[in-house]
Curated annotation (Swiss-Prot):
Membrane-spanning intervals of the chain: 1-21, 54-74, 90-110, 114-134, 192-212, 225-245, 253-273
Subcellular location, record wording: Cell inner membrane
Catalytic activity: di-trans,octa-cis-undecaprenyl diphosphate + H2O = di-trans,octa-cis-undecaprenyl phosphate + phosphate + H(+)
Any GO CC annotation of this UniProt entry: plasma membrane
GO molecular function: undecaprenyl-diphosphatase activity
Superkingdom of origin: Bacteria
Miscellaneous comment text of the record: Bacitracin is thought to be involved in the inhibition of peptidoglycan synthesis by sequestering undecaprenyl diphosphate, thereby reducing the pool of lipid carrier available.
Pfam families assigned to the protein according to its UniProt record, in alphabetical order: BacA (PF02673)
Source organism of this protein record: Anaeromyxobacter sp. (strain Fw109-5)
Official protein name in the record: Undecaprenyl-diphosphatase
Taxonomic classification: Bacteria, Pseudomonadati, Myxococcota, Myxococcia, Myxococcales
Amino acid sequence: MSLLAAVFLGVLQAATEFLPVSSTAHLLVFGELLGHDLADPRFRAFATIIQTGTTLAVLVYFRTEILSLLAAGLRSLARRRPLETPQSRLAWFIVLGTVPAAVLGKLFEERIEALGNWVIAGSLVVLGLVLLAAERYARHLRTVEDVGARDAVLIGLGQALALVPGSSRSGTTITAGMLLGFTREAAARFSFLLSVPIILGAGGYKLWKTVPVLRGEPSWALATLVGTAVSAVAGYLVIDWLLGWLRTRTTHLFVVWRIAAGVALAILIWQGVLPAGHASVSAPAVEAARAADPDAPLGAALRR
């Protein structure tokens, strides 16, 4: 992968990770259009690892709130009164909202990874329409301080739905928040805070699984490092822009974006430009391929 492509995909990851439009769909489509084999484990490792850049962006942007929530949660735990303050309640509701995605992600990990591009196209369109319904019919009056246990569970289920490729984690959680009556900005802010435990846990696990794929691949390792750094910087800017946008504007832009992207993806699949499905290659398979022929390029070794 060229460094220019890594920079482009890093910016794309940052924009589509936080906007409710699905980073998975955009990375796979543009990765294919840039000439990369979606089944190549190096590309899939790149696509996974650069997500740590956007994770870092969330941690830096919300660092004050995260530290405050962490301190409040620990103090309430020590006092055995978890709901004693608004901050401690929010901290524990974030933990509660993390449970659905953590449990379902572990149970259905392999099935989710096997889902193909038709599912991505369908998710883009269907959830775009749900976002439109949330925009048009829900009351947008509640703030982050109004989050309760029921809200945390329901938005957490929205986060679990984002395990389906093409759904968009920010898209499903922001939509769920809006359907529950939160303002657009409050729904987005809670979405970002809710993402911290799951992206640290799931992201760390995926990082551990995929980093070995890039061993002995210096050009891919460099491209991944550059893409990750770019996604971190761009991600910070995107978060700031999105929160400002949602204070005064609707989500109609993202509804149109999702539906257009879903239709475009369906056309590309139908025309044979993109595959209907994709194969995933595990780290053990990579090690086996390298053991069979240490001198062969990884892509060629895996195809044997």
